[in-house]
Each structure stands twice: as structure tokens, then as C-alpha cells.
Regions:
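Conserved catalytic-core segment of nucleotide-activated headgroup transferases in glycan assembly
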Residues: 28, 48-131, 138
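Membrane-proximal helix-turn-helix segments that form the acceptor-binding/catalytic region
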Residues: 2-26
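Short alpha-helical segment that forms part of, or immediately flanks, the ligand-binding pocket
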Residues: 134, 155-162, 175-176
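Short acidic alpha-helix that forms the nucleotide-activated donor recognition element
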Residues: 19, 129-141, 162
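Acidic donor-binding loop of glycosyltransferase active sites
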Residues: 137-152, 163-165
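Conserved donor-nucleotide binding/catalytic region of nucleotide-linked donor-dependent transferases
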Residues: 198-209
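Helix-loop-beta element that forms the nucleotide-linked donor phosphate-binding surface
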Residues: 18-29, 34-54
């Protein structure tokens, strides 16, 4: 119902913008978005892609191999993050070869945490200041982004790779992100995401030997 309401409002806004506003050029976040809008609304104006560069500095990586962990940034109060984490908790985490610690950052109410029925070594840090968040970013093996819904470029993924942190995500969430640090499979199946995380853990943990 939440997504349906957003969908209806977004469609109404898009039609108004495209029909009433006279512009010389449309700028899109991803190639997929550009092609979709050109086809749906028969856009004849010039269309281009926005730069996906964020003004964030690389951080010094000091990976904690003694107590390794993965990082999932993003408040679960945001519907898309909750949906993705729920999928990860139920379908992905139980099938990993190594039961590794996972830290979820961002606002998280006790109600939402209980709804997730989290098992295993999955912990919630709550909201963090920049210094503490960057400490986790520096120490983690990498970022996991179990995102399966939403539109546009996923800022948390873009921010992570530009900080120099590897990210394992879904094919869906990788759209618009061109980085050697962004790892994903050929589809959005559970088995593919599980395989990508397992492969990443095997590669990364072997570096500590």
C-alpha cells in the first residue's frame, strides 16, 4: 500500500512535469532510466546522464581480521531498506558458508527490529556520528547492500565505493554505478546474491592469511 501510494503520486508528478514544463534537455541518473522515460513518454528533447560522483574522501582501510564483520548502512525505518534487510535475514544470511558478524547502521526502532525476527550475529548500531561511522567503514570487510526495490542510483553504494570500500549488492541496485569495487551477479535471484557474498568472503578473508 505504501509503495502504491508513492507510485500514484510519482506518476502524477511526472506527467505534469513532462507535459507542462518546456525544457531543452532532460538529465537522468542511469541509462536504464533514460531509455525507459524516452520510450514511455516519447521524449524528443536532448537526454543526457548526470555525473554520479559524490564529494566524499577515501578513508584509510584498517580491516579488522581478528573479528571480521560486514556492514549494512541505512535506516530500516525507510521502507526499501527494511524490505531489503528482511529479505537478507530470511533468505540470504542463513545460507552463507560462514556465519559472519553483520552490523546494520542507522535509525532502527525496537518494533522494526522485532518484526525482522533477527537470528545469528546481526547487530544494530543505531544512528552514528560521522567519526564512528567511518571507523566502522574502515574496519569492515565490506558493505552488503541487499536492495531489491526503489528507483535511481543507490547513494549508500556510491558513497561506499568512493570511500574505497568494496560493496556486494544485487544486479538491481548496481544500476548507474560503474566501479571495480561493486560486485553483483547476472540476476537478482537469492542463489546469485548468496554466491556473490560467499565468493567475496572467501577472497577477502584469504587476504588475512
Amino acid at each position: 500500500l505504501c509503495y502504491l501510494n508513492d507510485y500514484i503520486k510519482l506518476q502524477f508528478t511526472e506527467v505534469n512535469i513532462l507535459n507542462r514544463v518546456k525544457v531543452d534537455e532532460f538529465v537522468f541518473l542511469t541509462e536504464e532510466d533514460k531509455e525507459w522515460y524516452q520510450d514511455k513518454y516519447n521524449i524528443k528533447q536532448l537526454c543526457s546522464l548526470a555525473s554520479n560522483h559524490l564529494y566524499v574522501e577515501k578513508i584509510e582501510r584498517k580491516i579488522n581480521y581478528k573479528t571480521p564483520f560486514l556492514l549494512i548502512p541505512g535506516s530500516i525505518e525507510f521502507a526499501q531498506n527494511y524490505h531489503g534487510l528482511n529479505w537478507f535475514v530470511k533468505n540470504i544470511y542463513p545460507n552463507l558458508n560462514k556465519k559472519i558478524k553483520v552490523i546494520v547502521t542507522g535509525k532502527a526502532s525496537q518494533e522494526k527490529i522485532k518484526m525482522l525476527k533477527v537470528r545469528g550475529e546481526i547487530y544494530f548500531s543505531g544512528e552514528l556520528d560521522v567519526i564512528k561511522f567511518n571507523e566502522l567503514c574502515s574496519a569492515c570487510l565490506g558493505v552488503i547492500a541487499p536492495i531489491t526495490t526503489g528507483t535511481g542510483i543507490k547513494i549508500k553504494i556510491l558513497e561506499a565505493v568512493q570511500k574505497g570500500i568494496p560493496v556486494v549488492t544485487t544486479k538491481f541496485a548496481s544500476k548507474g554505478i560503474d566501479s571495480l569495487l561493486c560486485f553483483y551477479g547476472d540476476d537478482n535471484k537469492d542463489s546469485t546474491f548468496i554466491r556473490e557474498i560467499n565468493n567475496f568472503l572467501e577472497r577477502t578473508l584469504s587476504d588475512s592469511v
